[in-house]
Structure formats: C-alpha cells, structure tokens
C-alpha cells in the first residue's frame, strides 16, 4: 500500500460521464449469488425420559441435516452434555445458513450420555424431533415447541427451538472510492474506469458481488458511493479476501484490464487512512517490466456501517405470509384421462401441476400459522350448468375456498379435475384481483400475500393482467407464475419485470412483484422429482424476501416487536463429549 494520493471529490451528478458496466459477470445474477443470512438455533428440552436408575439423565442433543434432494442425514453438530437433568437448556448453539427459498430439513436426536465415548450407540436414545428451519423461523417469536417422539408408547417430553439472526448478517456498508493516475488505455482519450468487487469462497474461487458505474474519460475517477450487505461482501467473515479489479470500459464489452488489488472487510473498516490506499497492479506487466511499480492507486474515501431491518425481523414480529394458489383448467392442457395431458393423474407420480404446487407450498406454509390456503381455478366450465369461470374455489365452496395445508390443496385439485370441464380462455386478471382485494385491506404490515399461478399456455387477457399487476404492485403481495408444458411463454417473460417494469395505460408498476419460470427448465434428467421440485422452489421463491422488504420500506412499515425471548432458569453442571 502506498501513501495516500489526494483525490478531489467533485459534486457527483448523474450525467453522460456515468455508464453501466456490462460484460464482466451477470449482475442480474448477483442477488442469487449472495449467501443466506445465518441464524443461531438454541435448544431446550422439558420432561425428558429418565434413563438413569439412581439419578436423572445426562442429556446431549445431536443435530442432523439433509442435503437438497438427498435422503441421507448427516451429523451437523452436538451440544454439550448437561449432567443430571430432565430439563436441559443447552448453551452450545447451532449456527445455520438460512434460505427462505429452500426447505432445510433438520433432525434433533437426544441421548442420555453414559460414558465419555463419542459413539452415540453407546448411549441411551431419548427420542428425536423432525422439523424445517423455516418452521422454527416462521413460528411466533421464532420459537417452536414440538413433542419429542421415537420411543413407542412413551411420552418423551418436549423440545423448544429458538432461532436468532446473527447480527453481522444484518449489516450493510456504504463505501466510496476514488483512483489516481490509472493507466491510459484508450488511443484517442483517457480511460473510462470502473471497479469490480469479488468475495473469495472457501474453495479459493471468487464470486462477483458488486460493480461500480463507469466514469468516462478520466485517469482520476471518483465513483459514487454504493451500499452492499456484509453478507454479499464477505459472507460475514471480516478477514476473508476481497479482490477488486479495475477495468477500462469499452462499448463492445471487451473491457481492458488495468489492474487489481486485494483487501478485507477488517482493513476497509479502518476507514479513510493511509491503510486504505491500494496499488493497482497488473500481474502481466509486473512480470515483464523490471521498472514497473503499479498502474495507479485506488483510495477508500468513506466507509459507513448501517444495520438494516431484515425479512426475519418482520417474521419474528409476527408478519404472516398468506399463500393462495390458482390453477389453469383450460382445454389446452389436454383431457385429464389421457396420459399425454398435463393434468393426468398418474397414481405413481405427481404431474407438473402437482409438483409445482407441492414444491412452492411446502416452503411457504411454514410462514402461515393456520396452514389454511385458498385454492382457485380458472378457465373451466363448472357443474351443474356449464358456466365458464375464471375464479372458482377448488373445494367447491366459493364462500370458503380454504384448504387444510398443501395436502388439502392437492386433494381439492384432484377432486376438481373429476367435476369440471376444461375450457378457456386463459385469463389471469380475475385471480390476481381476487388476492388483491384481500391484500388491499391490510395496511399495517401484519400480512403479506403470495399468489402462485400454474399455467400451461398463452395468456388471453394480457392488457387486463398488466393493469391488475400495476395495481397490485402498490399492495403487500407477490405473484409467482410457473409455466408447465411445451408452450412458448414469451408473454410471461414480459410480465416478469426484471428487465422492463410492467406498465398499463401509461402507469408503471411501483415495484417488481412477478416472478415467472418455465417448469421444463427444472426437470431433473435422472428422474429425481425431489431435486426438480427443490430447484424450482429455490428459483421462484428467491425474490420474495426482497419484494417483501421493498413494500415495507416504501410504506415506512417497521417490524413489530418480537415477543420476549424465552429465558430458561439457570442451573446444572455441564460436561462435553
């Protein structure tokens, strides 16, 4: 590092000097690359089985996890042993990565420790509990109580699991950089420099995490300040290497490499000082030229840490996610009695509609306390008079379209297939407006609505659907569209406002609330449907937390205070194995 060069800091204006940099990585994928937040899971038990003759049990808790699409359980970690108690409050916590969009299966096994052997078969089994991380997080106050099971005919007590988001995962930093005397790369002018930031991974590879704007025609650029989460920058590891590459922007995308330097969060946190002036080095030049020193310097101008309100703060404060499904019953799906139909009920495996419902629903249900889900259909003729409907209850009860859990939704779907006649057209607006009516009545942040539409075809009411989406973008709701079958889904891509915000009659959507994916992109070639469903859920749900937060921020809604944390009585002696 070099003694600080002075950077003049002009008033930044949004003019022709600034251009977005493209071609180095795909910034649309940055959000997907950001690691999960991390939560600390605490374990307590009450009324464990007493396996010791002359004293109480000496319990330990062992956590097992399952990889996505894999049935094998792997040991994740163990608590300490607490001597002589049936009501342990374990001190050692389990720290887990948390993804809203993934089903993270957990198994907690309890043992009475009888010796110092680490082999669990040498100790008495006290029972076990199965749950998901989403279940713990989604419970009131992120505190889940479940009965311990596993020993037939015996009451094994209760486990109490609490989840707390780690503070380092909630921080974001606002940083600004400038550079001095960068190499001139353009023949007829000065360089057009921009910075690309990468965080290092545990395997030594690097993942792009931020790209600055381009400052045109200067060797002494001052970039605009930018905000990035600590998770994205270094995954919460303050000593992890951060690599910064400096490029000269070219219109054709073949940006010229100027040089690079490395730093870490801990170094950057020192702020503006001689420690945060970096030599920009081009390794090729350094290897070829003996007199080469550097290709300029980059200086940190400011570094400010902010603690942000997170998705989990709202969930812990009691916000409920209300999940509604809407299924396409148009004739283009094919006769449900024929194996070629997308609605065919194969007794041995789920059809594409069933897989989409189950994949998304099984994750979202963890955030809904009553587990009652409205299930709607559209595009069918209904008995007894053949009336065409684009908003009918799958359970046949328009006054109460709620189904009990995802299994209840599946049952209502299968029953509907036997009673309605597939027809058309493919109209989305009625089901979007149905959910919007409920969402419009909730203005305090206590509920957020997610609508899953599963469809096979080309949308018929595009203008009305766009208008419905623009109106819904002001409400606490998100829309997931899963396209099944071989159709072209160009119109659906238009509704997914990642590139161009949806508009209707000159009005643009207030925020992007639609996520579309074609199911065929997720079918596992080996026939592993569990893996197909996990991949689908991961992609369609990944944007929900940010869409949720964008609504809450825009409305200035703060999370409700979480219920007081459970404070166990202090007691007992602790040992470890």
From Swiss-Prot:
One of its GO terms (molecular function) is metal ion binding. Probable calcium-dependent phospholipid-binding protein that may play a role in calcium-mediated intracellular processes. Binds 3 Ca(2+) ions per C2 domain. SMART domains: C2 (SM00239), VWA (SM00327). Ca(2+) 1 binds at residues 52, 58, 112, 114. This is Copine-8. Belongs to the copine family. Ca(2+) 5 binds at residues 186, 248, 250, 256. Ca(2+) 3 binds at residues 114, 117, 122, 124. Residues 322-523 form the VWFA domain. It comes from Mus musculus (Mouse). Ca(2+) 2 binds at residues 52, 112, 114, 124. Residues 19-146, 155-278 form the C2 domain. The modification Phosphoserine is found at residue 273. InterPro entries: C2_dom, C2_domain_sf, C2B_Copine, Copine, Copine_C, VWF_A, vWFA_dom_sf. Pfam families: C2 (PF00168), Copine (PF07002). Keywords: Calcium, Metal-binding, Phosphoprotein, Repeat. Ca(2+) 4 binds at residues 186, 192, 248, 250. Its cofactor is Ca(2+). The gene is Cpne8.
């Amino acid at each position: 590092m070099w003694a600080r060069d002075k950077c003049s800091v002009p008033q930044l204006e949004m003019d022709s000097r600034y251009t977005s940099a493209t071609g180095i990585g795909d910034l649309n994928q940055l959000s997907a690359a950001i690691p999960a937040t991390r939560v600390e899971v605490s374990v307590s038990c009450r009324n464990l089985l007493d396996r010791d003759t002359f004293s109480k049990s000496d319990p330990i808790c062992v956590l097992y996890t399952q990889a996505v699409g894999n049935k094998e359980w792997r040991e994740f970690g163990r608590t300490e042993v607490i001597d002589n108690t049936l009501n342990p409050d374990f001190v050692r916590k389990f720290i887990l990565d948390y993804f809203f969009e993934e089903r993270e299966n957990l198994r907690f096994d309890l043992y009475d420790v009888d010796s110092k052997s680490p082999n669990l078969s040498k100790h008495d089994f006290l029972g076990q509990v199965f749950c998901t991380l989403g279940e713990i997080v989604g419970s009131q106050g992120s505190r889940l109580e479940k009965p311990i099971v596993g020993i037939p005919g015996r009451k094994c007590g209760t486990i109490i699991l609490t989840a707390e988001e780690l503070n380092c995962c909630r921080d974001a930093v606002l940083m600004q950089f400038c550079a001095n005397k960068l190499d001139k790369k353009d023949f007829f002018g000065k360089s057009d420099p921009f910075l690309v930031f990468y965080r290092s991974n545990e395997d030594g590879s690097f993942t792009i995490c931020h790209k600055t704007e381009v400052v045109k025609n200067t060797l002494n650029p001052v970039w605009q300040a930018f905000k990035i989460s600590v998770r994205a920058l270094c995954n919460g590891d303050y000593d992890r290497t951060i690599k910064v590459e400096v490029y000269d922007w070219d219109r054709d995308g073949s940006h010229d490499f100027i040089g690079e330097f490395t730093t870490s969060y801990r170094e950057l946190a020192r702020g503006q000082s001689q420690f945060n002036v970096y030599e920009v080095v081009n390794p090729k030049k350094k290897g070829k030229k003996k007199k080469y020193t550097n290709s300029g310097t980059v200086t940190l101008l400011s570094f400010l840490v902010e603690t942000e309100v997170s998705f989990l703060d709202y969930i812990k404060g009691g916000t409920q996610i209300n999940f509604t499904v809407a299924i396409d019953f148009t004739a283009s799906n094919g006769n449900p009695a024929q194996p070629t139909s997308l609605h065919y009920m194969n007794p041995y495996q789920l059809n594409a509609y069933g897989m989409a419902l189950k994949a998304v629903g099984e994750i979202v249900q963890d955030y809904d306390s009553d587990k009652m889900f409205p299930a709607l259909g559209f595009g069918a003729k209904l008995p007894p008079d053949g009336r065409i409907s684009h908003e009918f209850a799958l359970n046949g009860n328009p006054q109460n379209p709620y189904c009990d859990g995802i299994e209840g939704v599946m049952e209502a779907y299968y029953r509907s297939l036997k009673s309605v006649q597939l027809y058309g057209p493919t109209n989305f607006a009625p089901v979007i407006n149905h959910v919007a009516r409920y969402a419009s009545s909730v203005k305090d942040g206590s509920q957020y609505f997610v609508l899953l539409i599963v469809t096979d075809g080309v949308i018929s009411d595009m203008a009305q659907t766009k208008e419905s989406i623009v109106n819904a973008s002001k409400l606490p709701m998100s829309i997931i569209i899963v396209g099944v079958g071989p159709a072209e889904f160009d119109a659906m891509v238009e509704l997914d406002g990642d590139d161009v915000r949806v508009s209707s009659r000159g009005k643009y959507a207030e925020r992007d609330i639609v996520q579309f994916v074609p199911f065929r992109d997720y079918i596992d070639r080996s026939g592993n449907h569990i893996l197909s469903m996990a991949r689908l859920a991961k992609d369609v749900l990944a944007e929900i937390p940010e869409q949720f937060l964008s609504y809450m921020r825009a409305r200035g809604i703060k999370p409700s205070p979480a219920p007081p944390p459970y404070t166990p009585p202090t007691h007992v002696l602790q040992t470890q194995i």
